[in-house]
């Protein structure tokens, strides 16, 4: 066992040869490297698989022995200062390593087909492998300096992948937005690290925790300064895990390829913030105010993310806000001191969300056969619908992921989210009420995404409905109800579909978009699949290739069974509790790790009832009678203009505007922060050029003109110079005489 731990340092470096060799190959032998590009995908999967096997072996040993291993190399600069580098293997490290490798392998296999048509195929796999290296280095770090180095590398890789299609202005802006937003958090993280080094004199986790606890117990620290440093450390996690108020980069990060959306949102970048807070939990728990602050940020993010997901049209953006909300649950659990529940939800959510993102990628891939490569159309749920019979495997997998995130047993997220919801009652009834209400919202918006995507009719080919219309112009709002007659065609928040009497209707035009040439002539992926690729444009979507479906099917297995890690069987300690021993739990300090099945069943029925209510509301608004457009006469019979209905419409539109406009937070930042910074920069530029540079330049210019005037008056004659000389001397003497008189 000791020998296994001694070689654990190799974990972060195994995937590293792939990006290095791809880079050298493209520089030295570009033609040969590109012609053998399938080989690089295979190598990426192979090396990450070796890391996965090694991580699983370490995890099994930790479950059996609850061991923690740390190895440190010391680089002594002088007698007073030395740098130490090493690796730390504990339950948190092994959990994160397994998450990163399992999700990473499946995303790489999926990407081989998804990115096969892209000219940046090799660049994509180089970024992905380096991303895995950076994240594995982060979770195995033994001190804050290493954490910060790999933290920045993880951020760099995510920026490169978000802006992967950098020729698209939207993707370039999204990359810039992610970079600037994370700079705020990363700067706070750096200041916090330096602050705690100033307090304790150490970057190593063990020494840091021990010294700091001694200082706290002896009351030898300034609590205000300590709290400030802790808030700065937490600021890095706020930005990385897209917590309020630094969450604004996450929805725009969907501009990157869909596979990287799955990896970033499931097991890498956004999970890094949760990992950091979990790693520093022994530091935070002795600072009560920071724990309260963490839980406050978590509960705000939980509710905000859910409300912003309610009316999104882009399928990936809706899932992004869902990720934000679920990360809020994890942060809430950490703030409450429920360490096990937070990590449990991190595990279950990672696989469920990866399943949903890869499923959405399969849908987008199939929609591109109809609308061409246009993210505004291929990702628009309003143009989807009726995909059940065209992509049945994707549909069923997406349904399982949806039900898991809704909290329906026995799927993965039910077990972990239920723990957090139950613990919230022990912490704060107000927080618990918000958390439970958000569980219903989660069920609503996830079911809404599923229904808009797969149920009803394929809206790209929507034919006119049968039945008599009472007015010549209708609009079907995103909420699923018939709207009033609309005259302003540019009103974006309500008008989603306009139908004229006895006319065939389409969202954009009545032509079928052709697939781009480089999409049709795809290069075969490294897994050989027979009869791959359609050579003709289809009028309907078709199921994705087996190479894309294989990772989805594996994620279904994880979604079905990974939740059983945290279930108590026969009153024994569950696997997750044994894995995390010793664990931190401020809410169950005297717990004997047994479970009261009556209490569990009562809480489970309550949570499932709330989720079922959200699902029912979503079905009521989006299922058949509204979404199929087959019986508008029945709808019209229920629609009565009354003051009560007008009031409800106002509430509905206000909620819709709030959600669709991202809570106006982006607009606030754009108006006050971005515009203010631009004006400040313009003023600074003006002050620098006109005032700072203007004064010496003005003095020099004035001296030049005075010299020119004097030179012209003198005329070049010595007698004139002598005359002016004696005149100025006389004037000076007179002034001096009268001043001293």
Curated annotation (Swiss-Prot):
Coiled-coil segments on the chain, per record: none
Protein keywords: Chloroplast, Membrane, NAD, NADP, Plastid, Plastoquinone, Quinone, Thylakoid, Translocase, Transmembrane, Transmembrane helix, Transport
EC number: 7.1.1.-
The reaction(s) this protein catalyses: a plastoquinone + NADH + (n+1) H(+)(in) = a plastoquinol + NAD(+) + n H(+)(out); a plastoquinone + NADPH + (n+1) H(+)(in) = a plastoquinol + NADP(+) + n H(+)(out)
Stretches that traverse the bilayer: 9-29, 40-60, 89-109, 125-145, 147-167, 185-205, 219-239, 258-278, 283-303, 327-347, 354-374, 396-416, 425-445, 549-569, 605-625, 721-741
Cell compartments where the protein resides: Plastid, Chloroplast thylakoid membrane
KW Ubl conjugation (keyword) present: no
Keyword Thylakoid annotated: yes
One BP annotation, GO: electron transport coupled proton transport
GO cellular component, one term: chloroplast thylakoid membrane
A GO molecular function held by the record: quinone binding
Domain of life: Eukaryota
Root EC class: translocase
InterPro entries to which the protein is assigned, alphabetical: NADH_UbQ_OxRdtase_chlpt_su5_C (IPR002128), NADHpl_OxRdtase_5_subgr (IPR018393), ND/Mrp_TM (IPR001750), NU5C-like (IPR003945), Proton_antipo_N (IPR001516)
Membrane-topology descriptor: Multi-pass membrane protein
Complexes and interactors: NDH is composed of at least 16 different subunits, 5 of which are encoded in the nucleus.
Protein family: Belongs to the complex I subunit 5 family.
NCBIfam families attached to this UniProt entry: NDH_I_L, PRK06590.1
Role according to the record: NDH shuttles electrons from NAD(P)H:plastoquinone, via FMN and iron-sulfur (Fe-S) centers, to quinones in the photosynthetic chain and possibly in a chloroplast respiratory chain. The immediate electron acceptor for the enzyme in this species is believed to be plastoquinone. Couples the redox reaction to proton translocation, and thus conserves the redox energy in a proton gradient.
Protein's name in the database: NAD(P)H-quinone oxidoreductase subunit 5, chloroplastic
Organism: Pentatrichia integra
Lineage of the organism: Eukaryota, Viridiplantae, Streptophyta, Embryophyta, Tracheophyta
Gene encoding the protein: ndhF
């Amino acid at each position: 066992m000791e020998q296994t731990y001694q070689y654990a340092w190799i974990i972060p470096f195994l995937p590293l040869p792939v990006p290095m060799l791809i880079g050298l190959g493209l520089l030295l032998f570009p033609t040969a490297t590109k012609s053998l590009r399938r080989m690089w995908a295979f190598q990426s999967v192979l090396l990450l698989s070796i890391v996965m096997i090694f991580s699983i072996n370490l995890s099994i040993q930790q479950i059996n022995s609850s061991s923690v291993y740390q190895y440190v190399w010391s680089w002594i600069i002088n007698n007073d200062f030395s740098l130490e580098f090493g690796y730390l293997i504990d339950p948190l490290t092994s959990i994160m390593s397994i998450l990163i490798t399992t999700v990473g392998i499946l995303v790489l296999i999926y990407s081989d087909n998804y990115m096969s048509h892209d000219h940046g195929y090799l660049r994509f796999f180089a970024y992905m492998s380096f991303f895995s290296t950076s994240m594995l280095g982060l979770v195995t770090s033994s001190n804050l300096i290493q954490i910060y180095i790999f933290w920045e590398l993880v951020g760099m890789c995510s920026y490169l992948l978000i802006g992967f299609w950098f020729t698209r202005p939207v993707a370039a802006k999204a990359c810039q937005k992610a970079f600037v937003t994370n700079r705020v958090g990363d700067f706070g993280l750096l200041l916090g690290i330096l602050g705690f080094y100033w307090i304790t004199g150490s970057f190593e986790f063990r020494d840091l925790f021990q010294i700091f606890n001694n200082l706290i117990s002896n009351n030898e620290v300034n609590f205000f300064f300590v709290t400030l440093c802790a808030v700065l450390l937490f600021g890095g996690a706020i930005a990385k895990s897209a917590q309020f108020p630094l969450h604004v980069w996450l929805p725009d990060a969907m501009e990157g390829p869909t596979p990287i959306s799955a990896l970033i949102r499931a097991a890498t970048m956004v999970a890094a913030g949760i990992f950091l807070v979990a790693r520093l939990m022994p530091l935070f728990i002795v600072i009560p105010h920071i724990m309260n602050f963490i839980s406050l940020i978590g509960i705000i993010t939980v509710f905000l993310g859910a409300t912003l997901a309610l009316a999104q049209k882009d399928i990936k953006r809706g899932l992004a806000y869902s990720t934000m909300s679920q990360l809020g649950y994890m942060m809430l659990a950490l703030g409450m001191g429920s360490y096990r529940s937070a990590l449990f939800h991190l595990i279950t959510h990672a696989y469920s969300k990866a399943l949903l993102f890869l499923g959405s990628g399969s849908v987008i891939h199939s929609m591109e056969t109809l609308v061409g490569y246009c993210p505004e159309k291929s990702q628009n749920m309003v143009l989807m619908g009726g995909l059940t019979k065209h992509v049945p495997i994707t549909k069923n997998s997406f349904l399982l992921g949806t039900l898991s995130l809704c909290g329906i047993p026995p799927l993965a997220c039910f077990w972990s989210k239920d723990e957090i919801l139950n613990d919230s009652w022990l912490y704060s009834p107000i927080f618990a009420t918000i958390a439970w209400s958000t569980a219903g919202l989660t069920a609503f918006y996830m079911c809404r995404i599923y229904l808009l995507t797969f149920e009803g009719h394929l809206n790209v080919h929507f034919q006119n409905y049968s039945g008599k219309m009472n007015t010549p112009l209708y609009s079907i709002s995103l909420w699923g109800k018939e709207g009033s007659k609309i005259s302003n065609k540019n009103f974006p928040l309500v008008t989603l579909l306009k139908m004229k009497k006895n006319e065939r209707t389409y969202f954009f035009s009545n032509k079928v978009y052709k697939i781009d040439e480089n999409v049709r002539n795809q290069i075969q992926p490294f897994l050989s699949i027979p009869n791959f690729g359609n050579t003709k444009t289809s009028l309907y979507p078709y199921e994705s290739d087996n190479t894309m479906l294989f990772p989805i099917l594996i994620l279904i297995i994880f979604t079905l069974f990974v939740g059983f890690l945290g279930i108590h069987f026969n009153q024994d300690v569950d696997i997750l509790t044994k894995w995390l021993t010793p664990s931190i739990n401020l809410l169950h300090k005297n717990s004997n790790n047994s479970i009261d099945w009556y209490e569990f069943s009562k809480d489970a029925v309550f949570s499932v009832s709330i989720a079922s209510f959200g699902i029912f509301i979503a079905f009521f608004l989006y299922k058949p009678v509204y979404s199929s457009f087959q019986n508008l006469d029945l709808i019209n019979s229920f629609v009565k203009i009354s003051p009560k209905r007008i009031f409800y419409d106002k509430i509905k539109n206000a909620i819709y505007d709030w959600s669709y406009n991202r809570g106006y937070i982006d607009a606030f930042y754009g108006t006050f922060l971005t515009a203010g910074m631009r004006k400040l920069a313009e003023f600074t530029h003006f002050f620098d050029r006109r005032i700072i540079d203007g004064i010496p330049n003005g003095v020099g210019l004035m001296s030049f003109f005075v010299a020119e005037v004097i030179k012209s008056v003198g005329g070049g004659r010595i007698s004139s110079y002598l005359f002016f000389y004696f005149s100025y001397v006389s004037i000076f003497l007179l002034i001096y005489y009268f001043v001293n008189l």
